[in-house]
Amino acid sequence: MELVALCRTGFEKELAAELVDVTATHGVHGYPKARDGQGYVQFVVDDGAELLRCINAVVFDELVFVRDWFVSAGAISGLPADDRVSPLQNQFKAAFSGHIQEVADLLFLNVDSNEGKALSKLTRGVGSHLKRQLPLAKGSDWLGVLLLLSGSEGFIGVCPRRQRPRWAGGVARLKFPREAPSRATLKLEEAWHHFIPASEWDTRLAPSMKAVDLGAAPGGWTWQLVARSMFVDAVDNGPMAPTLMEGGQVTHRQVDGFAYHPPKPVDWLVCDIADKPARVADMIASWAENSWFREAVFNLKLPMKQRYKEVLRCREQIELRLLAAGRDYRLRFKQLYHDREEVTGHLELR
């Protein structure tokens, strides 16, 4: 049996390392099969029942590099063009009939690549026919998953309904606001969607809150804060978009982001400074030790090598300082869809 996990193309090694660690924490051991640039990793495990237990126990929102995932019996090759459904249906029955009686629905996934996107129409077509052949029950805790790699190869599998990303495949469906000064604005919006439940936006992202944006220019992240009717100190030596400055909600502080300290604690700190991740993590920890914010969203620009280990080091760096300070907190990281060679962190002080 295999755990198939999708990721950003180029981060297969990081995903493989994360899967090894996460499954081992839950007493499941196996080995990853990963190839650079394919956009997914197969984690092979001997005991299928244990793997199903594991995917049901791991908290999906705590994973960093996993965009989406499911359990499968392995890729099926040689799917005939005149009947792709039967081999997929047969493997589903053989692999899961002893563990899962029904699924609530069948999801259609594609690898986030040009080749994967080109298969989306075929996946929907095959999936619509396959769905009618599967044992469906709306009350089931499991979902079926179909992922085609080509016209003749693909996966059929299952995943728990409650261990899912907000968007299928982890591909955030957000519309770029024309008024925003840069496309980086979508990173902060996606971060809020990922880290903050929709039911809590009105209280945790409330009008008249005070915020600081470090590395603000030209104002992509500041725009999101202003759109939530917050008052923002935009900290950057570079110029801000003039339209952002017209409404009176933004104060431009032309100083270095690492040197700035707020005169009073604020509700939100956001930071998209391009610097060494350890330096950014150190700054976030300092702000947290001083209780200068309630919540923070920040980006860590990752090095070319040992990127997974760098995330772990930065997490430990922040956590050790918070534990020493006796602070109650929640810290999470995620490589969002709109992230590139980076991950986004969220720190909530309690």
UniProtKB/Swiss-Prot annotation:
Any one Pfam family match given in the protein's UniProt record, by short name: FtsJ
**Annotated localization:** Cytoplasm
Q: What are the record's GO terms for cellular component?
A: cytoplasm
Citing just one GO molecular function, the answer is:
S-adenosylmethionine-dependent methyltransferase activity
This enzyme catalyses: cytidine(2498) in 23S rRNA + S-adenosyl-L-methionine = 2'-O-methylcytidine(2498) in 23S rRNA + S-adenosyl-L-homocysteine + H(+)
Q: What is this protein called?
A: Ribosomal RNA large subunit methyltransferase M
Q: Which family does it belong to?
A: Belongs to the class I-like SAM-binding methyltransferase superfamily. RNA methyltransferase RlmE family. RlmM subfamily.
Q: Decide whether keyword Nucleotide-binding is in the record.
A: no
Q: What does this protein do?
A: Catalyzes the 2'-O-methylation at nucleotide C2498 in 23S rRNA.
Q: What is the scientific name of the source organism?
A: Teredinibacter turnerae (strain ATCC 39867 / T7901)
Lineage from the top down?
Bacteria, Pseudomonadati, Pseudomonadota, Gammaproteobacteria, Cellvibrionales
What is this enzyme's EC? 2.1.1.186
